[in-house]
């Protein structure tokens, strides 16, 4: 049974109904409609914690989707799943692909920074100070990019940049 017929959540049902109306009203081509259906089902499965099903849907959407901006969001969501599963290197690959297609995606930039920061903390705990500092510097660069795009977001990152002396831009604060 397609995921669109299994939504138990009111918000998911509402989103699905609205998406179906948009698909019927707006003149998309068949391929774009199919890609959107897979993307929508992927988001629904991801929200339900059904990561394998979500990935299957996202990969199908990627095969069909031609629009670079839409592809960036699909790649971003795939990155989220891999990150949630502790597959940080794989998540980084997808986030980097997403920002190659859409450099104005602050959430992907933030997630890259979060992974580098996490890896920096791990390196620090294991006594690899030079590696730790290099990873923290990478995290800082990605957080700065994310904050430039969304200055009212990422307050904790802004504070971390300030406290660690990695912020050259007072405009954040």
UniProtKB/Swiss-Prot annotation:
- InterPro entries the record matches: PSI_Ycf3_assembly, TPR-like_helical_dom_sf, TPR_rpt, Ycf3/AcsC/BcsC/TPR_MFPF
For this protein, the record's SUPFAM superfamilies field holds:
TPR-like
Organism whose genome encodes this protein: Gloeothece citriformis (strain PCC 7424)
The protein's topology relative to the membrane is: Peripheral membrane protein
Q: Where does the UniProt annotation locate this protein? A: Cellular thylakoid membrane
Give the protein's biological function.
Essential for the assembly of the photosystem I (PSI) complex. May act as a chaperone-like factor to guide the assembly of the PSI subunits.
Note the PROSITE patterns from the entry. TPR (PS50005), TPR_REGION (PS50293)
What is this protein called in UniProt? Photosystem I assembly protein Ycf3
Q: Does the keyword Membrane apply?
A: yes
Tell whether Repeat is among the UniProt keywords: yes
Where does it mainly reside?
Answer: membrane
Q: Which family does it belong to?
A: Belongs to the Ycf3 family.
The stretches annotated as TPR repeats are: 35-68, 72-105, 120-153
A GO CC annotation recorded here is:
plasma membrane-derived thylakoid membrane
């Amino acid at each position: 049974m397609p995921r669109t017929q299994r939504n138990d959540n009111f918000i998911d049902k509402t989103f699905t109904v609205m998406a179906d109306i948009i698909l019927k009203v707006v003149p998309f081509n068949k391929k774009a409609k199919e890609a959107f259906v897979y993307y929508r089902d992927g988001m629904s499965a991801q929200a339900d914690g059904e990561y394998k099903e979500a990935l299957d849907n996202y990969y199908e959407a990627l095969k069909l989707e031609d629009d670079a901006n839409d592809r960036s969001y699909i790649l971003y969501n795939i990155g989220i799943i891999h990150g949630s599963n502790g597959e940080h290197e794989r998540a980084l690959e997808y986030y980097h692909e997403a920002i190659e297609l859409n450099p104005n995606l602050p959430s992907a930039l933030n997630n890259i920074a979060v992974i580098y920061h996490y890896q920096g903390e791990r390196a620090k705990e294991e006594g690899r100070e030079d590696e730790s500092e290099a990873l923290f510097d990478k995290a800082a660069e990605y957080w700065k990019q994310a904050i430039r795009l969304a200055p009212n977001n990422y307050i904790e990152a802004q504070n971390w940049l300030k406290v660690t002396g990695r912020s050259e831009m007072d405009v954040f604060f």
